[in-house]
C-alpha cells in the first residue's frame, strides 16, 4: 500500500488513495494547523499524484524542504516532489533554531 506520513508536534497525518490531500496552515480549517506566525493561514498542501506526493506552497514566507541526503530547498508559490523522507519548515529555514517543522516519510 502506497502511503505518506507527516508528523508534526506529536501528531501523525497519513495520506493515501482514500486521503490524497493534506491542507497546511494557521487557519483552523486546515487539517494540519501550524502554530508558527511565520506560516500563512493557508500555507499549502501535500497532495498525492499517482505514486508520488508533492508539496504545493501557497505561502507568503515559503516552505523550506530538506530531503534525505540533499541540501535544503526554499519553495514559494511552487511545488516540489517529496520523495523518501525529510523535513518541511514553515516560513523559516531549518537552520533557524526557532523554525517550526514537520517530518515526512514516504512509506
Specify the residue positions occupied by each region the protein language model found.
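A short beta-strand micro-motif
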Residues: 2-8
Amino acid at each position: 500500500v502506497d502511503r505518506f506520513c507527516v508528523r508534526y508536534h506529536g501528531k501523525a497525518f497519513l495520506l493515501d488513495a482514500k486521503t490524497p490531500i493534506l491542507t497546511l496552515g494557521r487557519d483552523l480549517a486546515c487539517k494540519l494547523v501550524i502554530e508558527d506566525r511565520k506560516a500563512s493561514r493557508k500555507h499549502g498542501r501535500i497532495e498525492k499524484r499517482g505514486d508520488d506526493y508533492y508539496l504545493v506552497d501557497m505561502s507568503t514566507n515559503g516552505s523550506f524542504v530538506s530531503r534525505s541526503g540533499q541540501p535544503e530547498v526554499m519553495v514559494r508559490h511552487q511545488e516540489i516532489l517529496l520523495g523518501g523522507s525529510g523535513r518541511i519548515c514553515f516560513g523559516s529555514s531549518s537552520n533557524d533554531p526557532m523554525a517550526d517543522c514537520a517530518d515526512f516519510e514516504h512509506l
